[in-house]
Amino acid sequence: MRNTSKELQGATHRYAPCDWYYHVPVKRSEKAVDAPPASQIPGLSNLGDSHSENLPGTRRYWIKETDSEYVKLAKQGGRPDLLKHFAPGTRKGSPVAYSLPDWYIHHSKPPTASQQEVRAVSMPDYMVHEEFNPDQANGSYASRRGPFDFDMKTVWQREAEELEKEKKKLRLPAIDSKYLSKAGTPLGPKNPAGSRLSFPPVPGQKNSSPTNFSKLISNGYKDEWLQQQQRADSDKRTPKTSRASVLSQSPRDLEGPQDAARLQDAEASEGPEDTPESSQSPEESVSASTPAELK
């Protein structure tokens, strides 16, 4: 905060300090001052030894107003038997042992040794084995359960219970063949196989060899498929080309009875429209096929 009232006093005091901000320390005196004692408790510091004056005179200035009650008591030498407890009425005598107050115990007079109950030492229940006595057992007796093993039955008891459960199961009577003959045959198709449902085979489910991944990655299956397509196309084209080649051969080129028989088979395979032409003799067919200039 700026104090404007002191700005006009001069350039050196332009920014005067605020009185409320901090306290200006008092100027220190240049006189020698004795160092304070290391401890104010008597016997723990050399304050009494350093002075040459009489001890009672020096102890007079040990106690200060700023000292606490405990420090003042310690400087005076303390109180004798400060931590001892004196029973009421015996304060002037010798100190006695600490006695319990009346409010600390439940009864005013503690029981004597003869009145105290003798505690019986007993083992825990899970460490004591007691034989079962049916005479002493009541109707509400229940055997104790073990801490770990919860199966209280023997092997023979368990087998007997399982046999009883199997006997109690509901069993249907056996089917007699006499009743089946009296009831007659059920209505329906005679062929039992016809009544079964049959589904067509799903495409793609063939019992083939497992997939070869190296062949799959290198497009080997693709090449096989293309080769199969080419073979199928070539098989479709071969009968047409063989038939055309047989028909294009002339009787002069035919050698032997095999070629003649092949020509007759090719002519017979033609449709009914070509029957009149096929009825002609080989000489007429040859003359018809030759041009007029060569005749």
Swiss-Prot record:
The keyword Phosphoprotein applies. Residues 267-276 have a biased composition (Acidic residues). Residues 277-289 have a biased composition (Low complexity). Residues 205-217, 241-251 have a biased composition (Polar residues). Disulfide bonds: none annotated. Transmembrane segments: none annotated. The keyword Ligase does not apply. Residues 33-52, 180-295 are annotated as: Disordered. Signal peptide: none annotated. Keywords: Phosphoprotein. The modification Phosphoserine is found at S50. This is Uncharacterized protein C7orf57.
